[in-house]
Amino acid sequence: MARRTKEDAAATRNGLIDAAERVFCEKGVSRASLSDIASAAGATRGAIYWHFKDKVDLFNAMMDRVTLPLEEGCAQFSCLASGDPVARLRSVMAFVLGAVASNAQARRVFEIAMYKVEYVEEMAAIRDRHIAASGAFTAQLAKDFALAAEVSPLPVSLSPHEAAVALHALFDGLIQNWILCQGAFDLVKVGASATDAFLSGLGLKWGDGTV
């Protein structure tokens, strides 16, 4: 009986987070009320307060259930710790864009985090999470650009860090525009072509020596 009660409580909690995702996506975080979320979940405000301190706590629980795209990228760099650095850059970009395109829940939460919340006061922790992930991802990109430059020097005017910032901007722009345009283009296909065009523009080679 105790186990069933614990399972029921977990199911209720997850149902409330699911409902919060839908309501936050529809109304934005600031305009969404706990009553809206309770109604969407078929529950009461009391049920929300049983599991969460307030709306911010509920929002944080929603964010904790997913891995942000840049966090996915950092994890993938760790999985591909050796080998051709340019091929690794291509693989990481392709992996993360594919993960975004195929995971509806992560995509919805990322849309909320990008477009439907104000990062002020109690929401500052989420902004800090974005900044930390962004910095770590850029550092990983710069590391591989530096390794690649040892074989084929980058243009004099572009340092490994600057190349990393530029590729990071391309990555962010692709995801943000894809979400904003509601999947109007093939994120994986366009992302792969854009990544290859960017790397080729730097004169970098990968695999069989393709530029």
Model-derived features: positions:
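Amphipathic alpha-helical segments enriched in hydrophobic/aromatic and basic residues
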Residues: F24, S33-L34, R45, K55, ...
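Short hydrophobic/aromatic patch on the recognition helix
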Residues: A41-F52
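Short secondary-structure transition hinges
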Residues: A94-A142, P153
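Short coil/turn segments at alpha/beta junctions that flank glycine-rich nucleotide-binding fingerprints
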Residues: E26-S30, A81, N103, V151-S152
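Hydrophobic/aromatic-rich alpha-helical bundle segments in the mid-to-C-terminal region
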Residues: R4, A106-E111, A124-A132, A149-A197, ...
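Basic, helix-initiating cap at the start of DNA-binding domains
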Residues: M1-K27, R31-A43, D57-N60
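An amphipathic alpha-helix signature
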Residues: I17, N60, R90, A94, ...
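Hydrophobic alpha-helical connector segments
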Residues: A61, A75-R108, P160, A164-L167, ...
